[in-house]
Amino acid sequence: MVSHIEYTPAVANDWKQTAADVKKDYPHQFRRTLDCSTSSQLQSKLWIADVLLDLHLQHEKVALIGGWFANYITELLIGIGVSLVHNFEIDEDAKNISYKYNKRYKDNGKYQCSIKDVMTQKMEEDFNLVINSSCEHMYPMQKFRELNPELNCYYVLQSTDEEQYDDHINCVGSEEELALQANIIDVLYSGKIKLDN
């Protein structure tokens, strides 16, 4: 069971430096760095890592769709054996800040972030696993899958039914609705959890 992030001195150094750099260079992003560090953000990413371990899926090369700063998820994925995490973002600040959180992995080639709207542009490389833990913020994943029919991989999708936020444009009421939106028929795992916040 995956119950925590291994908080090593390297992680501490990168995350401390990120906080200092955001304060100095990206003060307008400070609130977002707090939002990405909530207990519910960690819970949802721990859940992903735990289920991936239980399913024994091949997951050497992972694409994150809208992975934001990828602070928790990258640490967890590398910890369970992923060789490469490639985050696809549309926000240049998110890319730059994600490189700060994940400097140790960027430097050794295990983390990349590209500015690319993957809902309108095809993927140019293969991945074993595609993770979208923020489906509520974008078009249904069926659009992505139709754009990339040759991509033969597993999908991990998370969403919410919390419609109170302006940027939640695509909430779902159930796991079944999420799978239906993505046109995924062969579901290896389905579940839901109540997050702290």
Regions inferred by a protein language model and the residue ranges of each:
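Short acidic, S/G/P-rich loop/turn micro-motifs used as interaction or catalytic elements
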Residues: 69-72, 91-93, 119-121, 133-139, ...
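Conserved acidic residues
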Residues: 60, 126-128, 153
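C-terminal substrate-binding/active-site "lid" region of AdoMet-derived donor-dependent transferases
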Residues: 139-197
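S-adenosyl-L-methionine
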Residues: 1-58, 90-129, 133
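Conserved SAM-binding loop of SAM-dependent methyltransferases across substrates and taxa
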Residues: 69-82
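Conserved SAM-binding motif I beta-strand of class I
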Residues: 83-89
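Conserved class I S-adenosyl-L-methionine
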Residues: 57-70
